[in-house]
From Swiss-Prot:
Residues 21-195 form the Exonuclease domain. This is Ribonuclease T. GO terms for cellular component: cytosol. Mg(2+) 2 binds at D24, E26, H182, D187. Mg(2+) 1 binds at D24. The gene is rnt. The active site is at H182 (proton donor/acceptor). Binds two Mg(2+) per subunit. The active form of the enzyme binds two Mg(2+) ions in its active site. The first Mg(2+) forms only one salt bridge with the protein.
């Protein structure tokens, strides 16, 4: 895992000690406590020597629907997921969350950060499904902040005048193929590219770092 050698450009100094982790989930409905999680992907970020945010590591898991949770046909029609397809190579929810948390903890330690923070497009949705899965899995230590997030829908609305992921990416000059949309891995990658573009654009415009006399 790469870390900038320039102390001024350490990731921990950019987001008040938070370690940003891009997340996307695909689900069997909109209720994080009643509807099943079907797919989850994360992308960790790093900062290069020039202080620009870059994509680092990726993790993606297809999830076996947790017994007792709803699987709504309307959701499956939308995301085109067959939750019982054996070729999905799906794993149970708890195992996936533990693998993700192990990767995130290593990143937090490597980057000398204090806590991970979810970065997502319409972040409340992804954050709530993640937290619900953690509760069901009875995992004691959660490296993610319990409520703070970075929402790229809000950020892109401010910076680009668009809140839909595909439209925001196109305006930002990021290629987006709708044929691959609603895959957790693809959407997380595009969300990561969008977040990096917005953060880096702000830096290029002189918005970061903040002048010492304003700190």
């Amino acid at each position: 895992m790469f870390q900038s050698k320039n102390i001024k450009n350490f990731l921990k100094n950019r987001f008040r000690g938070f370690y940003p982790v891009v997340i996307d989930v695909e689900t069997a409905g909109f209720d994080p406590y009643r509807d099943a999680l079907l797919e989850i992907a994360i992308i960790t970020l790093r900062m290069d020597d020039n202080g620009f945010l870059r994509i680092d590591n990726k993790l993606h898991f297809n999830i076996i629907p947790t017994p007792g949770l709803n699987i709504k046909k309307s959701a499956l029609k939308f995301n085109k997921i067959d939750p019982y397809n054996p070729f999905r190579a799906a794993i149970n929810e708890r195992k996936a969350i533990k693998e993700i948390f192990n990767t995130v903890r290593l990143g937090i330690k490597k980057q000398s950060c204090s806590k991970a923070v979810v970065v997502a497009h319409n972040a409340y949705f992804d954050h709530s499904f993640l937290m619900s899965a953690v509760d069901r899995s009875k995992i004691k230590y959660n490296p993610f902040h319990s409520f703070s997030t970075f929402d790229t829908a809000t950020l892109s609305g401010l910076v680009l005048g668009q809140t839909v992921l595909s439209k925001a990416c196109i305006i930002a000059g990021i290629e987006f193929n709708n044929n691959y949309a609603h895959s957790a891995l693809y959407d997380s990658k595009k969300t990561a590219e969008l977040f990096c573009e917005i953060v880096n654009r702000w830096k290029k415009m002189g918005g970061w770092p903040i002048p010492k006399n304003r700190k």
